[in-house]
């Protein structure tokens, strides 16, 4: 066992040869390297598989032995200062290593086909392998200096991967936005590291925790300064894990290839912030008020992420805001001190979200057959619908991932999310209400994505389709196709160009009621299809892309069994608590995570009921168009014309605008921060050109005219020179005489 731990230093370096060899090959033998490019995918998967097996072996030993291993090399700079580099293997490290490697392998296998026609295939796999190296180095770091080094490498890799298609201006802007936003958090992280080194004199985690605990216990430290340094450390996690208010980069990061989105959102970049807070939780827990601040940021992020997801048309952006909200649950759990629940949700969410992103990639891949390579169209749920019969495997797997994220048993996220929701009641009733309300919103917007993508009819085949924002709220286009900002008097579901509406599945016609309002830009306009006789249809992805999806389905189905929170007749089912025993004991002595069947079912019933209610609302509003037409009278009966109806329209449109415009936070930053910085830059440029350059140029001009003036006095006569000489000497003597007197 000891020998296994001694070789754990190799974990972050095993994937590193791939980017190095690809770079050397492209530099020295470009033609041969490109011709053998599929070989590099195999090497990437093979090396990461070795790391996965090594990590699983370490995890099994930790579950059985509950041990923590740290190895350090000292680099002595002088007698007063030395840097120590090493690696730390504990339950948190092994959990993160398994997440990174398992999801990384699935993403690499998936990418082999997804990126097969891309000219940047080799560059993609080089970036991905280096991304894995950076993240593995981060989770095995034994001190804050190593954390920061690999933290920056993770940020650099995310910059390269988000801007992978850098020739597209949108992608180039997105990677710059992610880079700049994360620099704000990283600068805070660096200042926090330096601040705690100034307080404790150590970068090592164990020494840092021990020294700071003693200083606080003996009241030998300034609490305000310590809290400020802790907030700076937390700022790094806020930016990296897309927590409010540094979350604005996350939806724009969807401009990268879909496999990148899966890796970033499941197991690498956004997970790094959660990992950092979990790693430093023994430090945060002894600092007054910082845990409350962490939980506050988490609960705000939960609510904002869920509300922003309600009106997104881009399937990947909808999933991105879902990630933001779920990361908020993890941050809330860490702020409440629910260490186990946070890590449990990190595990379950990682596999479910990877499944959803790879499923969305399969959908996008199939839609490109119809709309061409245009992310604005292939990722737009407005053009989707009716994909169930075309991509049945993708549809089923996406449905399972959706149900998991909604918290439906016995899927993975149900077990972890339910624990966090129950813990919130013990911490704060206000936070609990927000968390439970957002759980219902999660079920609503996730099934909205599912229904708009897979149910109904394939909307791209309606040639007169218009996507402009003039569709009423109450139609099937609710917050997904488009919505009218105008408050009209009456209500209708769909408006055709003639008063007869045709059902998709029958020839029966439906007459529009006279009270129905007219829509200038319809959601779907059904007219004659002209001379077109053939349509292209989406197709299921091939086995190389389906295999990772099916493997992630298995994880989504069964990974929740790791943390089943009850034991039965001496059989300990809660493997996760046993796995985390060393870390949990550092935080809570003799903590018992097991509960009885009755208590578990009582708590679960309420959370599942809320999720089912959200799903029901989504089905009611987003079911296929023909069903909505048949239920038009039912919906109309609930919404009568009058002042209440107008007020309801205003509220609904306000919520839609808030969600569609991301809470106007991006606009606020653009106006006050970006606009302010640009204004300051223009002012500085004006001051530099007019004042600084003006003084410099003025001295030169003054010297020129002074020289010209003196030159005009001298005409070449020696008598004039002598006269001026004696004149100035006389004046100088008079001045000296005056000063001496």
Curated annotation (Swiss-Prot):
The chain crosses the membrane at residues 9-29, 40-60, 89-109, 125-145, 147-167, 185-205, 219-239, 258-278, 290-312, 318-338, 344-364, 396-416, 425-445, 546-566, 605-625, 721-741. It is an enzyme of class 7 (translocase). It is a multi-pass membrane protein. One of its GO terms (cellular component) is chloroplast thylakoid membrane. It is found in: Plastid, Chloroplast thylakoid membrane. GO terms for biological process: ATP synthesis coupled electron transport; electron transport coupled proton transport. Its EC number is 7.1.1.-. GO terms for molecular function: NADH dehydrogenase (ubiquinone) activity; quinone binding. NDH shuttles electrons from NAD(P)H:plastoquinone, via FMN and iron-sulfur (Fe-S) centers, to quinones in the photosynthetic chain and possibly in a chloroplast respiratory chain. The immediate electron acceptor for the enzyme in this species is believed to be plastoquinone. Couples the redox reaction to proton translocation, and thus conserves the redox energy in a proton gradient. NDH is composed of at least 16 different subunits, 5 of which are encoded in the nucleus. Belongs to the complex I subunit 5 family. This is NAD(P)H-quinone oxidoreductase subunit 5, chloroplastic. It comes from Daucus carota (Wild carrot).
């Amino acid at each position: 066992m000891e020998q296994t731990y001694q070789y754990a230093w190799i974990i972050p370096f095993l994937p590193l040869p791939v980017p190095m060899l690809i770079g050397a090959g492209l530099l020295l033998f470009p033609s041969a390297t490109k011709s053998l490019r599929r070989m590099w995918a195999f090497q990437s998967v093979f090396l990461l598989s070795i790391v996965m097996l090594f990590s699983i072996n370490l995890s099994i030993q930790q579950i059985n032995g509950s041990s923590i291993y740290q190895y350090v090399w000292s680099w002595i700079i002088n007698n007063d200062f030395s840097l120590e580099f090493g690696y730390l293997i504990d339950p948190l490290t092994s959990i993160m290593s398994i997440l990174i490697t398992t999801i990384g392998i699935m993403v690499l296998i998936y990418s082999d086909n997804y990126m097969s026609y891309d000219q940047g295939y080799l560059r993609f796999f080089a970036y991905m392998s280096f991304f894995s190296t950076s993240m593995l180095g981060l989770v095995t770091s034994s001190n804050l200096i190593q954390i920061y080094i690999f933290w920056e490498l993770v940020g650099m890799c995310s910059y390269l991967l988000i801007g992978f298609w850098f020739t597209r201006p949108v992608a180039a802007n997105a990677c710059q936005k992610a880079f700049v936003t994360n620099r704000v958090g990283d600068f805070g992280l660096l200042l926090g590291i330096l601040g705690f080194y100034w307080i404790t004199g150590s970068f090592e985690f164990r020494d840092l925790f021990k020294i700071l605990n003693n200083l606080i216990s003996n009241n030998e430290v300034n609490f305000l300064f310590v809290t400020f340094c802790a907030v700076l450390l937390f700022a790094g996690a806020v930016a990296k894990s897309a927590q409010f208010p540094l979350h604005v980069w996350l939806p724009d990061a969807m401009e990268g290839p879909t496999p990148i989105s899966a890796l970033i959102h499941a197991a690498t970049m956004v997970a790094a912030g959660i990992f950092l807070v979990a790693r430093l939780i023994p430090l945060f827990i002894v600092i007054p008020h910082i845990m409350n601040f962490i939980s506050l940021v988490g609960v705000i992020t939960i609510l904002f992420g869920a509300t922003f997801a309600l009106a997104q048309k881009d399937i990947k952006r909808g999933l991105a805001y879902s990630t933001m909200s779920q990361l908020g649950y993890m941050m809330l759990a860490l702020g409440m001190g629910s260490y186990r629940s946070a890590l449990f949700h990190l595990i379950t969410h990682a596999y479910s979200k990877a499944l959803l992103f790879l499923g969305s990639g399969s959908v996008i891949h199939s839609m490109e057959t119809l709309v061409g390579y245009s992310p604005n169209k292939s990722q737009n749920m407005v053009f989707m619908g009716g994909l169930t019969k075309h991509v049945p495997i993708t549809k089923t797997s996406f449905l399972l991932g959706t149900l998991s994220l909604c918290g439906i048993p016995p899927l993975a996220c149900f077990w972890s999310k339910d624990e966090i929701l129950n813990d919130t009641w013990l911490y704060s009733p206000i936070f609990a209400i927000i968390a439970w309300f957002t759980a219902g919103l999660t079920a609503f917007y996730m099934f909205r994505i599912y229904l708009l993508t897979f149910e109904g009819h394939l909307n791209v085949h309606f040639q007169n389709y218009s996507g402009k924002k003039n569709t009423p709220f109450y139609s099937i286009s609710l917050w997904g196709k488009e919505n009218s900002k105008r408050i009209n008097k009456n209500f209708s579901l769909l408006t055709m160009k003639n008063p007869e509406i045709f059902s998709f599945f029958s020839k029966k016609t439906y007459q529009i009621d006279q009270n129905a309002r007219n829509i200038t830009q319809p959601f779907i306009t059904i007219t004659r299809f002209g001379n077109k006789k053939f349509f292209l249809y989406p197709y299921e992805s091939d086995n190389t892309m389906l295999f990772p999806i099916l493997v992630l389905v298995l994880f989504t189905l069964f990974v929740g069994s790791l943390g089943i929170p009850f034991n039965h007749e001496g059989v300990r089912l809660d493997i996760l608590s046993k796995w985390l025993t060393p870390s949990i004991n550092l935080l809570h002595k003799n903590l018992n995570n097991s509960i009885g069947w009755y208590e578990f079912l009582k708590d679960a019933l309420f959370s599942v009921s809320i999720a089912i209610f959200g799903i029901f609302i989504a089905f009611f509003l987003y079911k296929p168009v023909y069903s909505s037409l048949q239920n038009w009278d039912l919906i109309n009966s609930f919404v009568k014309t009058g002042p209440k109806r107008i007020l309801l329209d205003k509220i609904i449109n306000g919520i839609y605008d808030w969600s569609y415009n991301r809470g106007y936070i991006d606009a606020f930053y653009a106006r006050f921060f970006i606009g302010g910085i640009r204004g300051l830059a223009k002012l500085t440029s004006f001051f530099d050109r007019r004042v600084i350059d003006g003084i410099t140029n003025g001295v030169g001009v003054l010297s020129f005219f002074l020289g010209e003036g003196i030159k005009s006095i001298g005409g070449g006569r020696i008598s004039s020179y002598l006269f001026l000489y004696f004149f100035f000497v006389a004046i100088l003597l008079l001045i000296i005489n005056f000063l001496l007197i």
